[in-house]
Amino acid sequence: DLVIFCDDKRLPTAFLTSYYARHDSSLQIARQIAWKEDIKCEVWTAIIAQKILNQSYYLGECSFFEKSQSIMELYHGLEQFDPSNREGHSARIYFNTLFGNDFTRESDNDINAALDYGYTLLLSMFAREVVICGCMTQIGLKHANQFNQFNLASDIMEPFRPIIDRIVYQNRHNNFVKIKKELFSIFSETYPYNGKEMYLSNIVSDYTKKVIKALNQLDEEIPEFRI
């Protein structure tokens, strides 16, 4: 089990978890520390490509076709480990299209509060699965913030962020309390994955396990999630 504590901005600050999530956690941590840089690069890039693609798809779903195409072009030009920061360019187009040209993720408002809260809900699901897989949440693929205890979970969850964005956008005229209630629907709704409709908790479990297997070079297939 995993319990995450948040600060007044609804960002994670601490967590409680068991010492031994699985019987061979020491072996898995040794594997994690030894992950090859080229494999980490390949897996991270595939994950970020899915995030950018999902952002494009969601803008198209909202009939922002021109901006959707702009992000699709960034997707097609993505390079390993994204040296030109296409992920960042995509995010700017995406959020400004959804919430207005004056919107920034640093602003103190109900939209950002809801996004942060929703992302923390997602993060808690992924961090739990990372621990169950026997990995340390602190050691990420590209996320390497020394103050982030959830670097690996932050890396793996990227394609799923548009799930939260969709809920917040659909409720953008409501206050934070109302949006917060809607965000809990992620625990009861089903989503398409591997040709089936599945609960998000089950998708997160399968997705995380497959990413870890790819990093351990036990399975070459990197899973895909599409909104």
Feature-to-residue mapping (PLM):
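Short hydrophobic alpha-helical runs that function as membrane-insertion/retention elements
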Residues: 1-6
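Active-site helix-to-loop segments that bind/position phosphate- or nucleotide-bearing substrates
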Residues: 12-16, 21-227
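Short, acidic/turn-prone active-site loops that include or flank metal/cofactor-
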Residues: 7-11
